[in-house]
Amino acid sequence: AYHFPPVRVSSGIQRTLKFCTYLREYGWDPLVLTISPKAYEVTSPDQLNEIPEDVIVERAFGLDTSRHLSVAGKYFHRMAQPDRWVSWWPGGIWTGMKMIKKYQPAAIFSTSPILTAHLIGQSLQKRTGLPWIADMRDSITEPGYPRDPLTWKIHRKIEQQIVHRCTKAVFT
């Protein structure tokens, strides 16, 4: 999950935090794989205390292309496909595989927006064979969104891969 404390920009944080809290009531022990706080533009420690104490949180390396790989505030937008946090993908796979070996979860759950989270979930599923649940909070593609035709094609292809390859998809 990209949207996880200490990021301070999205209501998606609450969704992931509540999953961590309430899934335990149904016999699940959530593990959270998220990105390094360095990737977040705005952080706040305010919600860190809402993470249940017994929930394991691992943070993988990742950068925000627009901030960390730009020159004079400009960056090559094609480097940021499918999103600005694509550099999280390799670190997410590495950290996720270590977590899977150590904790042996029953399933993989990824949530978007931030398509890279689903790419990580898909990659982990392919390597482990674990069931993968893809939580699609917002539309990935719609007519005219994203505006850039190449980005639309890339997002559309990823969207189709997610729905085709995941074990279950959740749409809200």
Where do the model's predicted regions map?
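A short beta-strand/loop micro-motif in the catalytic core of glycosyltransferases
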Residues: 164-172
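N-terminal subdomain of nucleotide-sugar transferases
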Residues: 1-61
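Nucleotide-sugar donor phosphate/pyrophosphate-binding loop at the beta->alpha transition
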Residues: 38, 128-133, 141-161
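An aromatic- and histidine-rich active-site surface loop
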Residues: 82-94, 105-128, 134-136
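A short, charged, and often flexible helix/loop element on the N-terminal side
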Residues: 56-91
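Glycine-rich phosphate-binding loop signature in dinucleotide/nucleotide-binding domains
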Residues: 99-105
